[in-house]
Amino acid sequence: MEEAILVPCVLGLLLLPILAMLMALCVHCHRLPGSYDSTSSDSLYPRGIQFKRPHTVAPWPPAYPPVTSYPPLSQPDLLPIPRSPQPLGGSHRTPSSRRDSDGANSVASYENEGASGIRGAQAGWGVWGPSWTRLTPVSLPPEPACEDADEDEDDYHNPGYLVVLPDSTPATSTAAPSAPALSTPGIRDSAFSMESIDDYVNVPESGESAEASLDGSREYVNVSQELHPGAAKTEPAALSSQEAEEVEEEGAPDYENLQELN
């Protein structure tokens, strides 16, 4: 009988701490419901992943400050502006400046004929509706030519440039045509010698000076034909044109040595 009583007592003593722990856990869970939710979420997802709330973006301030409406200011009384007197019948005509601009833009302008047409048009609009009016094209006066470009050309004078006039009439020269200039000095010398060969001849000097020369050659002096007529007799006939060309090509001297006949 004693063993049957001791066994349930021992089991009851072992279950008491377990029941106490369960009661404590239940009371703690009822007091902290938020902690329970967090523990449940942690148990579902691994601890390495952290969930954060979405970042709320603050609204941008407006680029322009808000416009505050103010009540309109009281406008002062406007005085009527005096107008210049206009000629009769000129109210329905377009001004000259507008006509000029219309003419420049190639737009035809029209005007109504007579004041009766205007009255009829006004009456038509007020009573029966729009009425047709007769329009006639107005011929504008031609615009004056622009002379600014011509005036600028006349006023512009540049000293750095020369004004070249067209050769309308060729210049007539009264002077005789000059002889063609010779290009080389040798030809000029030969031509001069051909011209002067008739004026001068070479005659030997005195016998003493001829004997005194070392090489035995005689010296000659240019003497005019008029001063020495005897030498002119011994001068050979004038060379022909063909012989003169040969002399020029060979580079012969410009004078001839004539010896006095013994």
From Swiss-Prot:
This is Linker for activation of T-cells family member 1. Expressed in thymus, T-cells, NK cells, mast cells and, at lower levels, in spleen. Present in T-cells but not B-cells (at protein level). A lipid is attached at residues 26, 29 (S-palmitoyl cysteine). The gene is LAT. InterPro entries: Linker_for_activat_Tcells_prot (IPR008359). It comes from Homo sapiens. The modification Phosphoserine is found at residues 40-41, 43, 84, 101, 106, 109, 224, 240-241. Changing residue 200 to F: Abolishes interaction with GRB2 and PIK3R1. GO terms for biological process: adaptive immune response; calcium-mediated signaling; gene expression; immune response; inflammatory response; integrin-mediated signaling pathway; intracellular signal transduction; lymphocyte homeostasis. It is linked to Immunodeficiency 52: An autosomal recessive primary immunodeficiency characterized by T-cell abnormalities, resulting in severe combined immunodeficiency, autoimmune disease, progressive lymphopenia and hypogammaglobulinemia, and lymphoproliferation with splenomegaly. Patients develop severe recurrent infections from infancy. The modification Phosphothreonine is found at residue 39. Residues 28-262 are cytoplasmic. PANTHER family: LINKER FOR ACTIVATION OF T-CELLS FAMILY MEMBER 1. Residues 161-164 are annotated as: Interaction with PLCG1. Keywords: Adaptive immunity, Cell membrane, Immunity, Lipoprotein, Mast cell degranulation, Membrane, Palmitate, Phosphoprotein, Signal-anchor, Transmembrane, Transmembrane helix, Ubl conjugation.
